[in-house]
Amino acid sequence: MRILLVNKYFYRKGGAETYFFALAEGLRALGHDVAFFSMQHPNNEPSYWSKYFVSEKDYVGKVSAFKQVQEAATLIYSFEAKRKFEALLEEFKPDVIHMNNVHRQLTLSILDAPYLKRHHVPVVYTAHDYILLCPAYTMVNGGGAVCDACLDRHFMHAVSNVCVKGSRAKSALAAMEAEFLKLHHSYDKIDLIIAPSRFMKNKLDEGGFAGKTIAMQNFLTDSQMAMGARVANTHKFDDAQAGARPYVLFFGRLSKEKGILTPVSYTHLTLPTILRV
C-alpha cells in the first residue's frame, strides 16, 4: 500500500513526532511504501519528499509585527500548502493519507487538493491534542481552568476567555481559524479520526465527530519496548536496593496541561510514596 504521512514538523520535536517517525518505520517494516508531507526546517530529517515541503513558518519566535500580519492569513488557509500537496499527490499517488499535526503551519487547505476529489483517497487523522474542539489545543481556558465551552462549536468563547497565550488578539485569530474550518466543512473531508484514549474519543463525539472516531492507544516499536525493558529492569534493581518503596511515575513533558501538578498534589496522602519524573 502507498501511504502518505503528513505532519507539520519533520524532526523529533515532541510526542507527535515520535509517533510519526515510529509509524513510518513500522509501516515500512511491513512492506508499505511511505511518503511524507511537512514543513521546511533546519532540524529536519533528510527526505526525498522535502522538495514538496512548505516554507518554514514560526508562530512562536520573535518576528516583526508586519511579518505577523502577513502570515496571519496563511495560518488559516495556505495556498502554498495546497499547491505543493497537489504536486506530491500527482507524483506519489497514495492509497491512503494519514494526517497528524497539520494546523497553522500546513493547514487543512491540503484537503482541498483536486487530486483527492478526483481519486477519492481516504483520509485518516490522528488527534494528538484537542485542536478539533478547542482553539487553544488544550481545553484549558485563559484562567487556567479545564474548559469545554467550545464543544457547542461556537469558538468565540476562546476570545472572551482569552484562552490563547494570554492574548486576546491571538485568541481571536485562533477562534477565527476554528470558525473558518467549521464553515468550510474541512473536517467533513476526513474519513476517520483516531483518538489515543477513550476519554478523547468521548470528547470528540460530544463535539460533533461521532460516527467517525475510534479509540486506539499509541503503539510501541520493538526498539521502544527493548528500551522500556532496560529501564524497568534498572528501576527494579534500584527498588530492591532501596527497600522497594512505592512510587508514582510521571512520564511526559513538564508542562501544566500534561498534569504534572496532579501527582504532586496527592503524593502526601500516601507517604512515603516517591514521585519519579
Each predicted region: which residue ranges?
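Conserved small/polar residues in nucleotide/adenosyl-binding loops
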Residues: T267-T273
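Active-site helix-initiating loop/hinge in glycosyltransferases
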Residues: G15, L204, K258-Y266
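Membrane-proximal helix-turn-helix segments that form the acceptor-binding/catalytic region
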Residues: I131, C147-L192
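N-terminal strand-loop element at the rim of the active site
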Residues: N7-K13, A24-F92
